[in-house]
């Protein structure tokens, strides 16, 4: 039976990060770098790293519980759990592990992989289920443990990444607080940023071989990714604003994927968004992929800076290459 269409609102957020952190001075003991070199080029001062006993599912579950508590929603009332990640504990996915950990026994759970764009892509996916009336309460988790796939001898990339998780609760609402969005992908640029599988032939019979191997560390063309981000992100934000019938001046907060402070500054400058409206916590977390947006959102909300009704322009961008933006109002 066709359900009645409805709006949606973001009603709670939460986050989690491993206890262990590694600052730039500590990193300089591992590779030839320095705090000044890293901070001046990336804005990063420290990053949280998952230890041997930390799991992505554990971090995701903590973030989820914090978001549910803020939204005043019971886990048993959830209809759907979406996990945006590229680094699950289980290659088949970790959303069901989070479902079990928080006791969301009635919720459907599955992973969504869109790298650093994953949280925005996940938000729009969740919105379709709510807007069509299929589900009313959705938990969206963005979590990554990129330290598993970093080459800790490569000073160009190992300085960038950290581990963490963030989550939001999206609920059916009479007034639709998701005002507009735009999503894009360009597979022709895949080689700019990837974690490639590398296998070797293993003979099964005289005529049949299979490939067995593992994934290689993160490979990134930093200059191309920077050029891509500073050109495409302002475009997609403006496209989402146009769909929302809003202008840049209507934005209360610009919430970008925390990839590099230089990218945040360049995008804000192109959009003519003042620095005081740009949310940034990259100094303490680094690039946590799908977790950056909800991590930064949660910190800003809990500091009391984001108020009910504030308009937030969020944009994720990264491997694929993929990029997207969502314009939404904070409900709580």
UniProtKB/Swiss-Prot annotation:
GO annotation (BP), single? fatty acid biosynthetic process
| GO molecular function terms noted in the UniProt entry | 3-oxoacyl-[acyl-carrier-protein] synthase activity; beta-ketoacyl-acyl-carrier-protein synthase III activity
Region span, ACP-binding: 258-262
Report the superkingdom from the record. Bacteria
**Active-site residues, as the UniProt record annotates them:** 116, 257, 287
Name the InterPro entries for this protein: ACP_syn_III_C, ACP_syn_III_N, FabH, Thiolase-like
The kind of enzyme this is, by top-level EC class, is transferase
Which reactions is this enzyme annotated as catalysing? Answer: malonyl-[ACP] + acetyl-CoA + H(+) = 3-oxobutanoyl-[ACP] + CO2 + CoA
About its domains, the entry says: The last Arg residue of the ACP-binding site is essential for the weak association between ACP/AcpP and FabH.
Question: In UniProt terms, what function does this protein have?
Answer: Catalyzes the condensation reaction of fatty acid synthesis by the addition to an acyl acceptor of two carbons from malonyl-ACP. Catalyzes the first condensation reaction which initiates fatty acid synthesis and may therefore play a role in governing the total rate of fatty acid production. Possesses both acetoacetyl-ACP synthase and acetyl transacylase activities. Its substrate specificity determines the biosynthesis of branched-chain and/or straight-chain of fatty acids.
Subunit details: Homodimer.
Protein name in the entry: Beta-ketoacyl-[acyl-carrier-protein] synthase III
Q: Which organism is this entry from?
A: Acaryochloris marina (strain MBIC 11017)
Lineage at the top is: Bacteria, Bacillati, Cyanobacteriota, Cyanophyceae, Acaryochloridales
Q: What is the gene called?
A: fabH
């Amino acid at each position: 039976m066709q359900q009645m269409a409805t709006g949606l609102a973001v009603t709670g957020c939460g986050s989690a990060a491993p206890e262990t952190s590694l600052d730039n001075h500590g990193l300089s003991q591992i590779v030839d770098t320095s705090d000044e070199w890293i901070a001046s080029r990336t804005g990063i001062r420290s990053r949280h790293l998952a230890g041997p006993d930390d799991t992505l599912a554990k971090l995701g579950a903590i973030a989820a519980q914090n978001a549910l508590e803020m939204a005043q929603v019971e886990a048993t009332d959830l209809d759907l759990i979406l996990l945006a990640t590229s680094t699950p504990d289980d290659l088949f996915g970790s959303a069901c592990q989070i479902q079990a950990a928080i006791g969301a026994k009635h919720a459907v759970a599955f992973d969504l992989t869109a790298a650093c764009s994953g949280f925005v892509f996940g938000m729009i996916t969740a919105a379709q289920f709510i807007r069509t009336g299929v589900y009313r309460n959705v938990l969206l988790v963005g979590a990554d443990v990129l330290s598993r796939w970093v080459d800790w001898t490569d000073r160009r990339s190992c300085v960038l990444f950290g581990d963490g998780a963030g989550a939001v609760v999206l609920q059916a609402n009479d007034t639709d607080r998701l005002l507009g969005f735009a999503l894009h992908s360009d597979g022709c640029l895949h080689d700019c940023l990837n974690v490639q599988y590398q296998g070797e032939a293993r003979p099964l019979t005289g005529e049949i071989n299979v490939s067995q191997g593992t994934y290689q560390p993160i490979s990134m063309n930093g200059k191309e990714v920077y050029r891509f981000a500073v050109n495409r992100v302002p475009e997609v934000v403006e496209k989402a604003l146009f769909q929302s019938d809003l202008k840049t001046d209507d934005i209360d907060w610009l919430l970008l994927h925390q990839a590099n402070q230089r990218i945040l500054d360049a995008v804000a400058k192109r959009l003519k968004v003042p620095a005081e409206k740009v949310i940034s916590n990259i100094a303490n977390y680094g690039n946590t992929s799908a977790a950056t947006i909800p991590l930064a959102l949660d910190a800003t909300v809990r500091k009391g800076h984001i108020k009910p009704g504030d308009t937030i322009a969020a944009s994720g961008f990264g491997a694929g290459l993929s990029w997207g933006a969502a314009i939404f109002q904070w409900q709580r």
